[in-house]
Amino acid sequence: MKASISTKLDQLAERLDEVNALLAREDATANMDQYRKLSREHAELSPVAEQYGQYRQAQDDLATAQALLDDPEMKEFAADEIDAARERLQSLENSLQTLLLPKDPNDDRNLLLEIRAGTGGEESALFAADLLRMYTRYAERRRWQVEIMSESPSDLGGYKEVIVRIAGDAAFSRLKFESGGHRVQRVPATESQGRIHTSACTVAVMPEADEVGEVEINPSDLRVDTFRASGAGGQHVNKTDSAVRLTHLPTGIVVECQDDRSQHRNKEKAMKVLAARIKDMQLRAAQAKEANTRRNLIGSGDRSDRIRTYNFPQGRVTDHRINLTLYKIDMIMDGDLDELISALSAEHQADQLAALGEES
């Protein structure tokens, strides 16, 4: 094990002792915020310290076995013990390196998923609806909740733009690599000659701010417009200005919500989307800065990056970031995304491990 990693592990073990002492104090629960913070830190440090303890025990076992090599009667036994200890040490070192990887603080958050039709006109809007169904089915498989926050339907039942909130266990950690350009190649329903068309959508996955107040939005930086919601008319036509448009002047971000009949509810939804977009902008700026100093294969989430192609005639889906092609497009479009997502997560972890090796 590299000296820098060993030093880091010693420091974490010492910190766990300090946290244990603080949690054992009689007045530990006097400040509940501090108590919860220490409890979370304890939960994060304990697995690392436990594995490091096993690693040090394996080091002791190796030293003991090596000392037995000089004894002719114990030589064969000692050689077997040395092989076993070395194998155990390597396995534990790999586990410890993984545990030391930087945690994404947003991994446990809920998220806002935004799908926008791009090149390809009505076919692109129809594909946006297909992508929404794909992610909704995936969410259902994982027992997550999906709520439409804002939608702009197209004439043929697709979406020019749709934003949904997805809430559930580790939702952002599973879907955060979906940001980018999604390209589809297929014969559109509107095509009479049977020609294959190429169109595209962009997907943005944004961690939800725990509270809108988590993202600082100065009221003076906000322009609020209300207007009458558009709809199909009839008896449910909206006769009040319930639709809300928020414009964040410093960034130029504009959010509209008109799906609810309550202006208050529409404004509440719009504020959630606005806060997530501002937070996402801040995250991408930080990631761009990080990418200047080291390779960041998966996590850039640049909207202009074409990340995936869905080729219906060939029945394949290709993720261009990791050169993975799967010939099960129907299953994937029905929400079977785990193989894709797990491969992306594994590549990201390998990228982090390589960076950890460079730093140490």
Curated annotation (Swiss-Prot):
Keywords on this record?
A: Cytoplasm, Methylation, Protein biosynthesis
User: Is this entry keyworded Cytoplasm?
Assistant: yes
User: Where mainly found?
Assistant: cytoplasm
Q: Where in the cell is it found?
A: Cytoplasm
GO MF annotation list: translation release factor activity, codon specific
InterPro entries found in the cross-reference section = PCRF, Pep_chain_release_fac_I, Pep_chain_release_fac_I_sf, Prokaryotic/Mito_RF, RF-1
Q: Does the keyword Protease apply?
A: no
The lineage's top-level taxon is Bacteria
Q: Which residues carry this modification: N5-methylglutamine?
A: 235
The record's section on Pfam families has: PCRF (PF03462), RF-1 (PF00472)
- State its role: Peptide chain release factor 1 directs the termination of translation in response to the peptide chain termination codons UAG and UAA.
One Gene Ontology CC term in the entry: cytoplasm
Spell out the protein name for this chain. Peptide chain release factor 1
Name the family.
Belongs to the prokaryotic/mitochondrial release factor family.
The record's section on PANTHER family has: LD18447P
What processing steps or modifications follow its translation? Answer: Methylated by PrmC. Methylation increases the termination efficiency of RF1.
The organism is Cupriavidus metallidurans (strain ATCC 43123 / DSM 2839 / NBRC 102507 / CH34)
